[in-house]
Amino acid sequence: MWHNMAMTRLWFRCGLAVFLLVLAGSAFAAPRLERERCTFKPPRGDRIECFTLIVPENREQPEGREVRLKVAVLKAKRTVGAEPLIYLSGGPGDAPLMASSPGADALAEGDWWNETAAIRRRRDVVILSQRGAGGATPNLDCFDPRTTDPAKARRRAVTEQQERDILVRCRAGLDKRKIDLAMYTTPALADDVSDLASAMSLAKINIYGVSYGTRWGLEVMRRYPDLVRAAVLDGVYPPQVNGEQNEPEIVRQAFEQLYAECTADPLCRERHPGLRSAVEGKIDAAERAPVELTLQLEDGPHPVRLDGSKFLMVLLHMMREGEAALIPETVAAVQRGDVRLLKMFAEDLESNDGGLLEQNAQQFDGLYNSIECRETWATVDRAARRKMIETSGVYGFNARTSKSPAFCPVWRVPAAPATERQPVKAAVPTLLLSGTFDWLTPPAWGREAARY
């Protein structure tokens, strides 16, 4: 009898131990939110809550490394229980919760409170960091080892071989930390959104994706169609599209639209009758004799030489910023020796995106490399792309400057399976937005996504 009772107690203890282990394991694997102190300063009358979302790096190994993602909830004016709007940022690698300089307020910099005021009348707006980007741990960003200040790294002149060496060291450092770059993908980011909804006890969400964030949002809709109540996709970038393959033709089409609209407008046609030849001629002339400017930036004046590629970059930036109508006058002014308009837009481009000075930290963005090398460059026909660049005249100058063909072999990530490149078919009410002159996500891509 005592033997049976002892055995019963033993089995009970063993069973309890196993149960507790299973419970602990499942609790560890489950996504969870931890409240944290907000560093953002909302305007009077507005409220914000800040959290860290904790999820597994590899969901097939939930006991392994954790990923920590910043979350900001801009609270609705009224608590009515409406499904929140989750903002999906672009890039990949954009970090809307990270300020451009220490001590600054990222939400104030992005004018988030004003931009979301109408939505927040009855819905919370939730901003989620991208895994691997700013605001997340681990962060895959790499900077020039001569400085840890991104702004200074951005101003340093480095050769392409030095850039490559930086990435080699960065990749080796990530390997040493046992960070699995194969887990920093669009599907993994989509799973993070689902885990966020689960941790917030949300049965339904609305999503607003911008640029790359539209591809992120489409993947959420593919993987979790019952989770998404409605979606707005702004600057549509569907998974079946490879933007790098035909970039020169996309750039050409944006300018063809500009030429056509100028011809159709009596005033533009009268003032700029030879717009095509003026634009192409000035870009080509800058390639042979760069336009010299001094940009007035936050950290002081910086001389820059705009060759054909950089001159084209400024014009493309004007298109994306809704200033395409000023391109004819900007080019005409430069022909007269007046570079004031060109300088103004060059300063705006360098301040916001970089790319005109010798170097900028964007190309050391590890998450960008991980996703673009895996999902885009792995399927690019490089010989066909080179031929298109060579035969596209000035419209191929921008594509010619891409470093990804040289950097992706260094980054060493596996190619995405073909299933991820299939169109997304989801019965979710969706508003697709595309800018007429948005050459990075042209209107044709929105029409392509709408077919499904």
Where are these regions (language model features)?
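Catalytic-loop region of hydrolases
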Residues: 26-157, 276-287, 412-416
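A catalytic-pocket lid/entrance helix-loop region that shapes and gates access to the active site
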Residues: 114, 141-151, 217-282, 313, ...
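Conserved acidic catalytic loop of the alpha/beta-hydrolase fold
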Residues: 175, 190-205
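Glycine-rich nucleophile elbow surrounding the catalytic serine of serine-hydrolase chemistry
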Residues: 191, 209-221
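Short beta-strand immediately N-terminal to the catalytic nucleophile in serine-hydrolase-like folds
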Residues: 207-209, 234, 433
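Alpha/beta-hydrolase fold active-site neighborhood
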Residues: 280-425
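Short beta-strand/loop motif that positions the catalytic acidic residue
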Residues: 426, 432-434
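Conserved alpha/beta-hydrolase "acid-adjacent" motif
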Residues: 439-445
